[in-house]
Amino acid sequence: MPKIRTQVNCRVHTEVARQGILFNKDKGQHILKNPLIIQSIVEKAAIRSTDVVLEIGPGTAELQKRVQGTIYQSKLQIVIGDILKSDLPFFDLCVANIPYQISSPLVFKLLTHRPLFRYAVLMFQREFAERLVAKPGDKLYCRLSINTQLLARVDMLMKVGKNNFRPPPKVESNVVRIEPRNPPPLINYQEWDGLIRIAFNRKNKTLSAAFKQTTVVTMLEKNYKIHSSLNNKIVPDDFDIKQLINYVLEKANAENKRARTMDIDDFISLLHAFNAEGMHFT
């Protein structure tokens, strides 16, 4: 058995050396090698002749090769840098097999970019992709699910097995289409995310239990007093933030609800109920 492993490793290293490329798996450098998968991704992207297309983590340029020898070759621009630290240019579409380690921050960097792009066709680790599209009641439904779906429509396009990459990752992959909601929802995202963080910190517990945590109570009381001061509202000496929290939850009929079963409309209604009583999450 050791001999077989040595022979396999030898063949892999020989191929890598022949191409002059060394891949670092710790940095998510798994190169998509199946031309049929690559072509399918390009087709599903439905790129128009006038589109500006952003690709992230081009690897061995398998996607860019599609413009070689065409009238679009002269328009190709390569930018070297950290995508999470760089200002994004204008673009219509984003088509990419991204490093999986940056999946979550990259999704929200794209969705908060202005002006809005039309949509993105991206490759993710399968479990991450399934979290993106998960619905209330699903096992994988989480803060990532609801925050992404607040800002975008998300659709699963295709599954991609790990053997389609070089070197093969330990996980399976999916291609996902993310289309920003245009116009964006009329909501303060920082306020929204503050509420969602509390609710999904323990998504299986009731909201009543989630809002009894000391850190949550302290934060809401501090924010209440700050906003009251900014609006010249006097806070009584006997003010009890816990009573106000319970009042809002009961009024919204949400005290016994659990985050894992609540949808976007449920949380928007709850956020408005808190804000109406002068309670804020930022």
PLM region descriptions:
Residues 1-198, 269-282:
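Catalytic cores of RNA-modifying enzymes
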Residues 173-174, 178-180, 184-245, 251-266, ...:
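An accessory alpha-helical subdomain
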Residues 15, 41, 210, 247-248:
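Residues within well-ordered alpha helices
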